[in-house]
């Protein structure tokens, strides 16, 4: 499907109502989708996705997202604890900015569980089958991890080792 046809289909779907947000990839310049969303009272999530890693310019990119949309969203692929700490520091940079911070892949699972501690307004869970790397089921987020009950005051403790995903600790 051509890009223009995709945008038109999205706008038609938005006009049917019932949506609060639309997610627009950051490489799409000011678009008719954004204009339609705002005219319909919807908020625009401006997002970047990086399936390879955490971009070196992540902080400037997040600031750019925050200035261009109602909500800034980053979905990147951390490969180590330093990458995870970088994602946590984004909240310090944009404390009062609506944002969604997601780490994809095995290293990113903690960002989905600790989304409130990271300052994210929401996280994404699947209906049992992951649609993105590292996605946790909505059931596990709620019942196993109690992600909705965690917050800024939640302490973080870790199990050191590799791998640890199988651990009951």
Regions found by a protein language model. Name each.
Residues 1-32:
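Glycine/small-residue-rich loop that forms an oxyanion/phosphate-binding "nest" at active or ligand-binding sites
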Residues 2, 25, 151-154, 169:
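Alpha-helix initiation/capping motif
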Residues 158, 162-169:
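An N-terminal-biased, well-structured beta-alpha scaffold segment characteristic
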Residues 27-156:
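Catalytic alpha/beta core domains of metabolic enzymes, predominantly
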Residues 22-23, 101, 163:
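A generic secondary-structure micro-motif detector
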């Amino acid at each position: 499907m051509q890009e223009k046809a995709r945008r038109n289909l999205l706008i038609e779907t938005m006009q049917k109502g019932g949506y609060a947000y639309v997610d627009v990839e950051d490489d799409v310049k000011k678009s008719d989708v954004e204009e339609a969303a705002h005219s319909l009272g919807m908020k625009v999530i401006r997002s970047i996705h990086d399936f390879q890693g955490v971009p070196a310019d992540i902080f400037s990119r997040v600031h750019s997202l925050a200035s261009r949309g109602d909500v800034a969203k980053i979905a990147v692929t951390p490969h180590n604890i330093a990458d995870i700490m970088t994602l946590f520091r984004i909240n310090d940079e944009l404390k009062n900015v609506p944002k969604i911070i997601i780490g994809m892949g095995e290293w990113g699972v903690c960002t989905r569980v600790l989304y409130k501690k990271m300052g994210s307004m929401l996280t994404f869970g699947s209906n049992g089958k992951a649609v993105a790397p590292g996605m946790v089921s909505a059931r596990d987020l709620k019942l196993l991890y109690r992600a909705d009950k965690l917050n800024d005051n939640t302490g973080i403790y870790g199990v050191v080792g590799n791998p640890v995903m199988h651990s009951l600790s």
